[in-house]
């Protein structure tokens, strides 16, 4: 089975072909209150989403877990803090990303530990995401041939 993958041209696939474009990706912006971020996360069904600025530059990632951890008090969730804190106060800044011209094998390796990888253009502007699901679906198609 591994030999089949090695002999195929799967590694020649461009990640742009598997990418979900930025206009279809749920995201929040710097300056948004945590309440807004939590609403976007809940409505989208995602556990984490990218954090962008007004120029579509990637700054980090916000997740339900980060938000809940930031409002967790000693005895209760301090829900009032959802409007007091901003996305940039709790976001994760070190996140996985690759350039749009990166190889499929690099994306595959990164997807092992991350459910999605942000894709940036040469100006480091956010252009979309590559999901672990789309990578696995492509591999599955090659294995079924």
Label for each model-derived stretch:
Residues 1-145:
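Tandem CBS (Cystathionine beta-synthase) repeat/Bateman regulatory domains
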């Amino acid at each position: 089975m591994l030999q089949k993958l090695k002999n195929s041209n799967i590694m020649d696939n461009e990640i742009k072909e598997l990418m979900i474009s930025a206009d279809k990706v749920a995201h929040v912006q710097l300056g948004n209150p945590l309440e807004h971020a939590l609403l976007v996360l809940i409505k989208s069904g995602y556990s984490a989403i990218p954090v962008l600025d007004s120029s579509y530059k990637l700054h980090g990632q916000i997740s339900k877990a980060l938000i809940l951890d930031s409002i967790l008090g000693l005895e209760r969730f301090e829900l009032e803090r959802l409007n007091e804190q901003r996305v940039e106060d709790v976001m994760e800044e070190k996140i996985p990303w690759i350039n749009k011209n990166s190889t499929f094998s690099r994306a595959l390796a990164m997807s092992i530990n991350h459910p999605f990888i942000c894709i940036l253009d040469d100006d480091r502007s956010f252009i979309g995401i590559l999901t672990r699901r789309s990578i696995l679906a492509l591999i599955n198609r090659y294995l079924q041939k």
